[in-house]
């Protein structure tokens, strides 16, 4: 990552994620009154006084608990601090200093970076000074009374933060970044895949379903191309999800699909294609994203020379409505074929952004109509395609101007889409055909009437 990092740390439920949302101007980190909601490192861009930087939210630090996740969370915090230029220790001004705050402060004093103390939940500026004064005892310098919810005092805190940051370098534009969402059912190996791709334990990996709750962004670069990888909460059937942090994480996962240009749909090779996989694929189609189907845990499958073909057939049968997607069989645990994912993602993004000239589109249409004319209606009306033109990309969208859209039934529309794919490719991306009525004389005036051969 090229931008400087500001790490947010503290014990559970002091308002770290609320502060991240305040500093970055968007509600991305999950906020809930259940302690320990944030487990992984989540990065978000921020800007203050001509400085661009990333704010990293971390899990709540607890030193005196044997819960399985806590050693993993501590490792995530250590990694975040190793990346950071400055850390913000968030404490609760209403509760005052706790033993946990003192323990964390002692640990932070051993780290080789500046630490600022943000005394949160100081809703009154007058009382905030008194609430903040107590935290001088932590030995980390002047406390900053703030209200993450209302924004009080955050400007002064940011002024001090940016004093530790270098001037902003010229950054490549957002249009150069390919957004890639990693989605799938719980425990199919999404976080393991992210870690294998990045080369570090970026997201917490655990055999317990639902470990990842936030959508987590990681910027990586391969062969000169930058990718933003978004690891998401596993998506289960709605009836199995309580209206707590996991519910919000699933909503975040759906929003991650909306943000993405390419989606990696991760399947578990041991489970095959499930009903929930089909629903996820349907969401990807609805959002118009490019897609690469990643079959994980391939190393655990007993194989013969036909296994991969049988599995591909199953994928094509059960996910036939997303049959244009590319497939790759990997093992995130062993790293098998993981590096080839970037090649597939790059090709899918290229096709997703692709534009085709009007002349080429009409050559395809002329051939298609010549091979298979539009069927006539029961009343004898013949469907006619006058011309087509691409009106947008991401995904490629082609408007077809016809005499009456009602004359073109689903099977013929699928035939036309198939001809575009056969002659032009579009592997890895959906294409959308817009059937529009147009009078014959208008088409003839343009001189682009598609005729039967």
UniProtKB/Swiss-Prot annotation:
A GO MF term: GTP binding
EngA-type G domain segment(s): 4-169, 178-353
SMART domains, per database record: AAA
Any Pfam family hit: MMR_HSR1
Binding site for GTP 1: 10-17, 57-61, 120-123
UniProt KW keywords: GTP-binding, Nucleotide-binding, Repeat, Ribosome biogenesis
PANTHER family, sorted: GTPASE DER
Family: Belongs to the TRAFAC class TrmE-Era-EngA-EngB-Septin-like GTPase superfamily. EngA (Der) GTPase family.
Subunit and partners: Associates with the 50S ribosomal subunit.
Stated name of the protein: GTPase Der
Species classification: Bacteria, Bacillati, Cyanobacteriota, Cyanophyceae, Gomontiellales
